[in-house]
Swiss-Prot record:
InterPro entries: 2-IPM_HCS-like, 4OH_2_O-val_aldolase, Aldolase_TIM, DmpG_comm, DRE_TIM_HOA, PYR_CT. The keyword Metal-binding applies. Keywords: Aromatic hydrocarbons catabolism, Lyase, Manganese, Metal-binding, Plasmid. Belongs to the 4-hydroxy-2-oxovalerate aldolase family. The keyword Lyase applies. GO terms for molecular function: 2-isopropylmalate synthase activity; 4-hydroxy-2-oxovalerate aldolase activity; manganese ion binding. NCBIfam families: 4OH_2_O_val_ald, PRK08195.1. PANTHER family: 2-ISOPROPYLMALATE SYNTHASE 1, CHLOROPLASTIC-RELATED (PTHR10277:SF9), HOMOCITRATE SYNTHASE-RELATED (PTHR10277). This is 4-hydroxy-2-oxovalerate aldolase. The gene is dmpG. Mn(2+) binds at D14, H196, H198.
Length: 338
């Protein structure tokens, strides 16, 4: 492979789910400086649910997105600052403010069959001169061909990179291969592709490797896998595997290993790992950020979180339907034998 992989770190955005969006500014700066020193290409910064995600529904952040973004932008010298925007949560106004605070990349994220809602945000990002990425979440919930058609929409709005996003950590390796082949068949040769994997079936690194084999340009990963559910593809593990495969990248593996174990892992109040609950996410194809919400609701009502998660999968709930976690719990209580 003759290209250099683009490494997109998501520790400070997806990883925010693992700490209930409670990173302090000092912690964000410390992590960003370590990532910058290790030469990752970009660092995504926002509430776990993207710009303006801080809310009753998704969980309130310890700081505003702009406070985190501005602090990280000032702290880094090599990496570019990225952010995430979900239309319907974040607005064009939020995007402009994030750009003013220092974000130079935006990933505009929609459910995998709803790319049409991203047009306004993608067009605005391009007008601001931002590196503009389309982010198709829950990509396991549609066919490769339908996903490719949604990717085409984002490309037509101005996105220059389209991501296959395995939000539920439910894709197998052949699933990833089929989706990238479908995208490559329809997108312009100059349009890049990216992979955002979750580790709920322990396939985060394997799926990222398959994506690269199919021509993927950008790889999302996080230190110690810090992310929703069982986490993302662990950055240090992916880089070690890439190095063993002889793939080019700009990262310092040892620096990433140190940052993962010395800085990030100690912040986890709940281990980011494959266990009964996070495995249920991948098995049932449930949005990974539902985990902490489901665990809290289960504790409140005397239920098992895994039962709630499996039922959410049966009902095909998607990101943004966090309120349904309580509904499912109440329904499960009603079905209990007196």
């Amino acid at each position: 492979m003759d290209k250099t992989l683009y490494i997109s770190d998501v520790t400070l955005r997806d990883g925010s789910h693992a700490v209930r969006h409670q990173y302090t500014v000092a912690q964000a700066v410390q992590i960003a400086k370590a990532l910058d020193a290790a030469r990752v290409d970009s660092i995504e910064v926002a509430h776990g649910d993207g710009l303006a995600g801080s809310s009753f529904n998704y969980g309130f952040g310890a700081h505003t997105d702009l406070e985190w973004i501005a602090a990280v932008a000032e702290a880094v010298h090599h990496a570019r600052v990225a952010t995430l925007l979900l239309p319907g949560i974040g607005t064009v106004h939020d995007l402009r403010n994030a750009h003013a605070a220092g974000a130079r990349i935006v990933r505009v994220a929609t459910h995998c069959t709803e790319a049409d809602v991203s047009r306004q945000h993608i067009e605005t990002a391009r007008a601001l001169g931002m590196d503009t990425v389309g982010f198709l979440m829950m990509s396991h919930m549609t066919t490769p061909d339908r996903l490719a058609q949604e990717a085409l929409k984002m490309e037509s709005y101005g996105a220059t990179c389209i991501y296959v996003v395995d939000s539920g950590g439910a894709l197998g390796m052949n699933d990833v291969r089929e989706r990238f082949r479908a995208l490559k068949q329809v997108l312009k040769p100059e349009t890049q592709t990216g992979i955002h994997a979750h580790h709920n079936l322990s396939l985060g690194v394997a799926n990222s490797i398959v994506a690269v084999e199919e021509g993927c340009d950008r790889i999302d990963a996080s230190l110690a896998g810090m992310g929703a559910g069982a986490g993302n593809a662990p950055l240090e593990v992916f880089i070690a595997a890439a190095q063993r495969l002889g793939w080019r990248h700009s990262c310092d593996l040892m620096a990433l290993m140190d940052a993962a174990d010395d800085i990030v892992r100690p912040l986890q109040d709940r281990p980011v790992r494959v266990d009964r609950e996070t495995l249920a996410l991948g098995y049932a194809g449930v949005y990974s950020s539902f985990l902490r919400h489901a665990e809290a609701v289960a504790q409140r009502h005397g239920l098992k979180a895994v039962d709630i998660l499996i039922e959410l999968g049966h009902r095909r709930m998607v990101g943004g339907q966090e309120d349904m976690i309580v509904d499912v719990a109440l329904d499960l209580l009603q079905t209990r034998t007196p």
